[in-house]
From Swiss-Prot:
It holds the Pfam family Cutinase. This is Probable cutinase 2. InterPro entries: AB_hydrolase_fold (IPR029058), Cutinase/axe (IPR000675), CUTINASE_1 (IPR043580), CUTINASE_2 (IPR043579), Cutinase_monf (IPR011150). Its EC number is 3.1.1.74. It is found in: Secreted. Keywords: Disulfide bond, Hydrolase, Secreted, Serine esterase, Signal. Its main location: secreted. Belongs to the cutinase family. It catalyses: cutin + H2O = cutin monomers. The record marks S52, Q130 as: Transition state stabilizer.
Amino acid sequence: MNYKLLTLALASLAAANPIERQRKIHPAVLSGGDELRNGDCQPVTFIFARASTEQGLLGGSTGPALCNRLKSALDGVACQGVGPKYQATLAANALPKGTSDEAIEEAQSLFQLAAEKCPDTQIVAGGYSQGTAVMHGAIPGLDDALKDKIKGVVLFGDTRNQQDNGQIPDFPKDKIKIYCAAGDMVCYGTLIVAAPHFSYIADVPDAADFLVSKLE
C-alpha cells in the first residue's frame, strides 16, 4: 500500500474540495452521531464509519446524509458513528487491514452495545472509504447471534472490495450492498484517490432504500 501516493492524490484534490461540495448537497445534520451511547433505544440503530479526515462521528458527507434519509423514512432511528478511538487518519489506510485495530475494536463494541442495551433494535450499518475497512474488519469477528441482528450494510468507495472479493467475510452477501463508482481506484486494491471517490452522495437514496428493505 503506497501511503505517499495516497497523500499526493488527496493533496491534488484539495483545491476542488469535493467533500465540501457534498456537504452543500445535504447540509442538514439531524444527529450528532452519538445516539446509541447517549440516547434512548430506538427500533432501528444505524452504525456508520466515516471516511479519512472527515470530522464528527458521522463525518460530513454520506454518513449524515444517510442518517437523515433513514430518519425521514422510518419512525425511530438512532444514528451512531464510530469514534473517538477511530480517528480516520490518512496513515491508517496503509495498515494491513486498511484501518487500525483500535477502530475495528471500537466498531465491534458499538455493535455489541446495540445488542446489549437495546435487545429489540434492528441494526443497519455503513461505511465510506476507510470506514468500509472498519466494517470489513469488525463484522466478521462478531458472534453469529449478533451478525443475525445486523440486517443490512452499505459500503461507499470500498477500500477492501477487491481484497475481500466484493463481500464482508463470514457475513451473508445478500445483506451487503457495495457502491463503487466508475473510475474509483480504491475499489480495485489501490490507494489512488480520484474524483469519482467523492461522488457517493448520489447513492445515498438507493442505499437508504436498500437498508429499509432489509428491516423486518
